[in-house]
């Protein structure tokens, strides 16, 4: 029988559980603003804006200083390393800005995906080296939760057993290191929407991946009440010719989660996976209205699905600040309602809100 050496004190556990609950309090979700310098370059390029440190700071400030209507909608914000140490125009560090609006500060801690030798183009995620020291420093600098993204692809022979096992293990090591440092880990095993697979295949793979992840978290003695899961919704591949209804997507998603995610997990914060802003809100709303028993908070951790319209409205011009913030507030309010199952699409979504945000082989 394995013997359990106490990994966390009752005080540490309470702190982690409290942080997780604050992030996914009713009506709240996460703004993922942790695009790496390379990823934000693509976003800025799409609006003809240069990728300078000042433009990145100004754009992040635009989101973080939106008016108080977003306060009841955003429980946490995930930042990239650079952004954690930037300041608003009034001199306040961004973590202070987030906390003043009732949000919890998060930080992306992985160092990106790398090829997994001996597989057909599959990957694992690097960044465990020195992670404990980085977490200790981030905690001092105001961060209370972290994110680590692993990526799996559906193909004829993928994901392989090796890729599933390796990524589950690396997520568990990351989660363990975070919890030792008082940081709530968001566990993100993203199954990419690339491919022509149907809904059933995605559901099957999602179940296998999540089962492996929670087995690894158990093996590594992770305190589940002090974690959040960031999964993909179960959807058909982008190249799948068969169309599936919102209801089918919802049933497949909730069923997969019910079969694999322990009720002890505090919250599930979905990634948008290249869905349009409107689609991401509609699906999240439908998931929350699903009549099956769902013991966790089911909310959002959206990047592009909260930012696309705001980015377009800003267009890199300072005079468009208010218009851009208005677009961001709109999406935040929509998703706040959606995570409570109270969202009714107005049918007036702008062009940007209905535009697919799919990028093949998406890397942060």
From Swiss-Prot:
Catalytic residues in the record: 188, 230
Residues bound to beta-D-fructose 1,6-bisphosphate: 43, 272-274, 301, 304
InterPro entries: Aldolase_I_AS, Aldolase_TIM, FBA_I
Locations listed in the record: Cytoplasm, Myofibril, Sarcomere, I band; Cytoplasm, Myofibril, Sarcomere, M line
Modified residues (N6-malonyllysine): 111, 312
Miscellaneous comment: In vertebrates, three forms of this ubiquitous glycolytic enzyme are found, aldolase A in muscle, aldolase B in liver and aldolase C in brain.
PANTHER family the UniProt entry points to: FRUCTOSE-BISPHOSPHATE ALDOLASE
Protein's UniProt name: Fructose-bisphosphate aldolase A
């Amino acid at each position: 029988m394995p013997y359990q050496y106490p990994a966390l004190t009752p005080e540490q556990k309470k702190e982690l559980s409290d942080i997780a609950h604050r992030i996914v309090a009713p009506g709240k979700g996460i703004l993922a603003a942790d695009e790496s310098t390379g990823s934000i370059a693509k976003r800025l390029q799409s609006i003809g804006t240069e990728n300078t440190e000042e433009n990145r700071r100004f754009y992040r400030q635009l989101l973080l200083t939106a008016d108080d209507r977003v306060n009841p909608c955003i429980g946490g914000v995930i930042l990239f390393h650079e952004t954690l140490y930037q300041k608003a125009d009034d001199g306040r560090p961004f973590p202070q800005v987030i906390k003043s609006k009732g949000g919890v500060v998060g930080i992306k801690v992985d160092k990106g995906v790398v090829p997994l030798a001996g597989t057909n183009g599959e990957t694992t995620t690097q960044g465990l080296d020195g992670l404990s020291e980085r977490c200790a420093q981030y905690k001092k600098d105001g961060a209370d939760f972290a994110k680590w993204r692993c990526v799996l692809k559906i193909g004829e022979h993928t994901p392989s057993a090796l890729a599933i096992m390796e990524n589950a293990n690396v997520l568990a090591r990351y989660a363990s290191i975070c919890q030792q440092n008082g940081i709530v880990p968001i566990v993100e095993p993203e199954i990419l929407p690339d491919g022509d697979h149907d809904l059933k295949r995605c559901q099957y793979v999602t179940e296998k991946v999540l089962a492996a992840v929670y087995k690894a978290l158990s093996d590594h003695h992770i305190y589940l009440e002090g974690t959040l899961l960031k999964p993909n919704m179960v959807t058909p591949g982008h190249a799948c010719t068969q169309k599936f209804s919102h209801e089918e997507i919802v049933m497949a998603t909730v069923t997969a989660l019910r079969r694999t995610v322990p009720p002890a997990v505090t919250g599930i914060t979905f990634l948008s996976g290249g869905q349009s802003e409107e689609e991401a809100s509609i699906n999240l709303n439908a998931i929350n209205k699903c009549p099956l028993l769902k013991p966790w908070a089911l909310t959002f951790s959206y990047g592009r699905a909260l930012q696309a319209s705001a980015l377009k409205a800003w267009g890199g011009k300072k005079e468009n600040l208010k218009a851009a913030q208005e677009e961001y507030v709109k999406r935040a309010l929509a998703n706040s309602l959606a995570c409570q199952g109270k969202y009714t699409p107005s049918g007036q979504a702008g062009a940007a809100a209905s535009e697919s945000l799919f990028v093949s082989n998406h890397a942060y």
